């Protein structure tokens, strides 16, 4: 990222082949879905259903053995319940994602980790390096950028998932922040997309591209992750309860 004060921290990513056009096409598809179906009928139950589907999928990616129907009936196992806890308070944190993102990260982790960690570890980074990674990400989010919102959401997700700044539940936190960023930046204000389910459907690609993001030198892994994220966001729209 460019260290010049007020410089766009994501500017270099806009030069990666296929990335700007891919996100533009994905956004067009999302906008068409939300305009053509969402604006005509958006009862709150659709948002609740999207959040539940997302929580169940995020739990599975984190290691839960409870599928959606089990979660729907009895809440599922402890990992699934952690993801559901996050989902129930998530949308109320949207304003923080563009103003005080560190507070949003902390609150999401506190919800996910409740009962699994000592209270003093809830919402707190594991160490000084992790705290630095969180601050750097937060600085990126409050700096003006020309990057499309869906790209920013993808970067937030990958940074949190690969840095693993908290003592537990980092994947759940990362996926929740991706959804929340789509809400906060106006892509999906009623949270009707299901990005977590998109990642679950593409699980092998999801996990391999996160590894590439974490381990590849230069921009190679970031480029691969962003191209993957374009596909995943398209699947997230396909899995919206608006399509039922």
Task: Identify what each model region corresponds to.
Residues 1-244:
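FIC/Doc superfamily catalytic core
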